[in-house]
C-alpha cells in the first residue's frame, strides 16, 4: 500500500494502514530521503516496508540499512534507459548476500517471462508483472503437444 506526501504524512498514513489491515499490509515508500526516513520509523515500529523506485545498488543498500523488508528495483524502466536492469538486481542480491542483509529483492516492472526468470536467476525473491506475463509462464509448446499425445492415448484406451 503506497503512501505519498511529506515524511510526516507518509508515516501517519503508513501507521493508519497498518492499524486497519494489520501485518498483511506492507507499506510502500519511495527511495527518497523522506521515504527512507519513513522506512526507518515504520520498520522500528515493526511494520513491513517496501522501498520502491530503486534504480541502483547504492539506493538498495540505503533502503536495507533503513530497515526495508523489500526493495523494488525497476528492471523494465532501467532497460528502457539502456541500463542493464538485471545486472542491478544481481548487484543488489550479491551485496545483500555478502553482508548478510535480509531485505528481499522484488524485481518490478517485469515485462516478459524471460525477464522474470532472469530476475530470479540473478537473486530476486519476488517478481511483479502484468497478468499477461504471468499467464505466459504456464505456456509451452511442448506441454501443448504432450497434452495432445496424452489425449490421443486416452482415447485409444477407451476404445
Question: Which residues make up each language-model segment?
Answer:
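Glycine-rich phosphate-binding active-site loops on the catalytic face of alpha/beta enzymes
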Residues: 53, 67-81, 122-143
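Hydrophobic faces of well-ordered beta-strands that scaffold small-molecule active sites
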Residues: 1-3, 25-29, 47-52, 71-73, ...
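Alpha-helix-loop-beta-strand connector modules within alpha/beta enzyme cores
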Residues: 19-21, 36-49, 84-105, 147-159
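Catalytic cores of alpha/beta
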Residues: 9, 13-14, 38, 56-66, ...
Amino acid at each position: 500500500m503506497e503512501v505519498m506526501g511529506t515524511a510526516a504524512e507518509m508515516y501517519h498514513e503508513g501507521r493508519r494502514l497498518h492499524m486497519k489491515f494489520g501485518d498483511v499490509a506492507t507499506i510502500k515508500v519511495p527511495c527518497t530521503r523522506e521515504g527512507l526516513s519513513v522506512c526507518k520509523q515504520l520498520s522500528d515500529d515493526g511494520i513491513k516496508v517496501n522501498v520502491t523506485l530503486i534504480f541502483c545498488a547504492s539506493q538498495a543498500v540505503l533502503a536495507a540499512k533503513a530497515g526495508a523488508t523489500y526493495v523494488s528495483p525497476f528492471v523494465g524502466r532501467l532497460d528502457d534507459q539502456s541500463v542493464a536492469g538485471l545486472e542491478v538486481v544481481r548487484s543488489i542480491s550479491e551485496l545483500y548476500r555478502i553482508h548478510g542483509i535480509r531485505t528481499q529483492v522484488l524485481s518490478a516492472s517485469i515485462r516478459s517471462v524471460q525477464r522474470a526468470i532472469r530476475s530470479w536467476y540473478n537473486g530476486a525473491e519476488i517478481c511483479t508483472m502484468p497478468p499477461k506475463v504471468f499467464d505466459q509462464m504456464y505456456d509451452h509448446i511442448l506441454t501443448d503437444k504432450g497434452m495432445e499425445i496424452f489425449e490421443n492415448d486416452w482415447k485409444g484406451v477407451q476404445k
